[in-house]
Amino acid sequence: MFTVFLLVVLATTVVSFTSDRASDGGNAAMSDLIALTIKGCCSHPPCFLNNPDYCG
């Protein structure tokens, strides 16, 4: 019975770890999308003036 318990804990840990890694990739993709959107904004003078912190 203890062996079954250990297998369940191990399986849960592996699934959780791989889910976290997949989610990190999604977060990185979202950061890239936000960066591209901000860069697009910075090329337009009205948007640039409204967002000086992002456009530097």
From Swiss-Prot:
Those residues forming the propeptide, per the database entry, are 17-39
**Which cellular component terms (GO) are annotated to the entry?**
extracellular region; host cell postsynaptic membrane
For the region Ser-Xaa-Pro motif, crucial for potent interaction with nAChR, give the residue spans. Answer: 43-45
Q: Does the entry annotate any disulfide bonds, and if so which pairs?
A: 41-47, 42-55
Q: In which tissues is it expressed?
A: Expressed by the venom duct.
Taken from the record, one Pfam family name reads: Toxin_8
Cell compartments where the protein resides: Secreted
Has keyword Oxidoreductase? no
Domain of life according to the entry: Eukaryota
Modification Cysteine amide, positions = 55
What's the PTM story here? Non-native isomers 'ribbon' (with disulfide connectivity C1-C4; C2-C3) and 'beads' (with disulfide connectivity C1-C2; C3-C4) also inhibit high voltage-activated (HVA) calcium channel currents in rat DRG neurons (20-30% inhibition at 1 uM toxin).
Q: Which residues form the signal peptide?
A: 1-16
Q: Which GO terms describe its molecular function?
A: acetylcholine receptor inhibitor activity; ion channel regulator activity; toxin activity
**Assigned keywords, A-Z:** Acetylcholine receptor inhibiting toxin, Amidation, Disulfide bond, G-protein coupled receptor impairing toxin, Ion channel impairing toxin, Neurotoxin, Postsynaptic neurotoxin, Secreted, Signal, Toxin
Q: Does the keyword Protein transport apply?
A: no
Q: What InterPro entries has UniProt attached to this entry?
A: Conotoxin_a-typ, Conotoxin_a-typ_CS
- Domain annotation text? The cysteine framework is I (CC-C-C). Alpha4/7 pattern.
Q: What family is this?
A: Belongs to the conotoxin A superfamily.
Q: Main role? A: Alpha-conotoxins act on postsynaptic membranes, they bind to the nicotinic acetylcholine receptors (nAChR) and thus inhibit them. This toxin inhibits human alpha-7/CHRNA7 and alpha-9-alpha-10/CHRNA9/CHRNA10 AChR (complete inhibition at 3 uM of toxin). In addition, this toxin inhibits high voltage-activated (HVA) calcium channel currents in rat DRG neurons (22% inhibition at 1 uM toxin) probably by activating GABA(B) receptors (GABBR1 and/or GABBR2).
User: What name appears for this protein in its UniProt entry?
Assistant: Alpha-conotoxin Pn1.2
